[in-house]
């Protein structure tokens, strides 16, 4: 083959190869550039419809409005409590009790609790570290509507231990108290000294009042307070037999014109049970609302809230 022909053919092949390489490089370069410039449509975030704000700012605005409304409600409630306390002549707004314990404290033998195997515990002071005390009202002689209203407006939790011979003249008064949150408990039928009664009479006094209160109020008491704070082992056994689980006594007593303390320091203590009575001017130097005002002011001044006894016993 002539050298000249071979050379021309070689140059033609070389030119074709170069052209192919150039075209391949151009195509590859164009493809890469297009991918970098325009991501797939799925990667582009969709714009919100015209005239509609983004979701996150709307949610934040709603949360802010809710927080402002809640704060306003709390402030209004606090102002109502101040006004109510003033209306009833209190020196300060009563303190709010903490949330009720998730379970009742164990009532082991101790300074404020007496235990006898198989019998309901006798409790003078509930074992708790909470700065709370408990108000209990005995008998049922005075049926003061202002006392009922004061309890309701100030939201004071109270336990009423009723004796039938005094309560029976107007059980409707105590039904109204129960409907507004007062717990109704047992204080015997006729308020006798149980130590002087035989088993049969004690049964009639304790379990008879259980039956009466269940019939009149609609609930069967769990708590029993013996008259004068006096009882025997037989009293506790009979009480347990008709549904009693604890026997709360007391450490302090509230009157219309003063408080009586059990201990020399003359102060309330966490878990103290306070006794008072359904009494009025015929028996006291004042009214039941005077008694409640004095007691609440003393508790508040000493840093105590009034809690519901049945949440702890």
What residues fall within each predicted segment?
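His/Asp/Glu-enriched short active-site or ligand-binding loop at hydrolase and phosphoryl-transfer sites
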Residues: 230-267, 304-311
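Structural recognition of the beta-strand scaffold that forms the well-ordered cores
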Residues: 133-137, 158-162, 183-186, 222-225, ...
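Active-site beta->alpha N-cap acidic-glycine motif
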Residues: 94-186, 190-193, 212
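Sec-dependent bacterial lipoprotein signal peptides
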Residues: 1-28
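C-terminal domain-boundary segment and adjacent tail
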Residues: 118-128, 168-169, 286-313
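CE4/NodB-like, metal-dependent polysaccharide N-deacetylase domain
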Residues: 45, 152, 157, 183, ...
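N-terminal low-complexity, Pro/Thr-rich disordered segments
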Residues: 18, 28-124
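Acidic-and-aromatic substrate-binding clefts and catalytic sites of carbohydrate-active enzymes
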Residues: 140-143, 162-170, 193-200, 225-231, ...
């Amino acid at each position: 083959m002539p050298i000249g022909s071979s050379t021309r053919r070689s140059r033609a092949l070389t030119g074709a190869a170069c052209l192919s390489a150039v075209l391949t490089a151009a195509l590859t370069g164009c493809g890469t550039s297009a991918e970098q410039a325009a991501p797939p449509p799925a990667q582009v975030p969709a714009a919100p419809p015209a005239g509609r704000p983004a979701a996150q700012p709307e949610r934040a605005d709603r949360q802010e409005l809710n927080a402002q409304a809640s704060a306003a409600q709390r402030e209004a409630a606090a102002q109502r409590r101040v006004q109510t306390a003033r209306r009833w002549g209190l020196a300060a707004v009563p303190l709010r009790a903490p949330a009720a314990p998730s379970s009742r404290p164990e009532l082991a033998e101790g300074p404020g609790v007496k235990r006898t195997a198989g019998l309901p515990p006798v409790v003078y002071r509930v074992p708790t570290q909470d700065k709370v005390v408990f108000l209990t009202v005995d008998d049922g002689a005075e049926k003061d509507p202002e006392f009922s209203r004061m309890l309701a407006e100030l939201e004071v939790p109270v336990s009423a231990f009723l004796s039938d011979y005094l309560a029976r003249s107007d059980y409707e008064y105590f039904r109204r108290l129960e409907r507004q949150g007062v717990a109704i408990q047992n204080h015997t039928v006729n308020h006798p000294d149980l130590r002087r009664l035989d088993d049969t009479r004690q049964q009639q006094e304790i379990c008879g009042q259980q039956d009466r209160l269940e019939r009149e109020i609609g609930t069967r008491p769990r708590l029993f307070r013996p008259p004068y704070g006096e009882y025997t082992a037989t009293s506790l056994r009979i009480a347990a037999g008709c549904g009693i689980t604890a026997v709360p006594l007391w450490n302090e007593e509230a009157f219309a014109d003063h408080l009586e303390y059990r201990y020399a320091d003359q102060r309330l203590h966490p878990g103290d049970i306070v006794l008072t009575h359904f009494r009025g001017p015929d028996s006291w130097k004042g009214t039941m609302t005077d008694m409640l005002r004095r007691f609440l002011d003393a508790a508040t001044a000493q840093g105590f809230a009034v809690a519901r006894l049945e949440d702890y016993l």
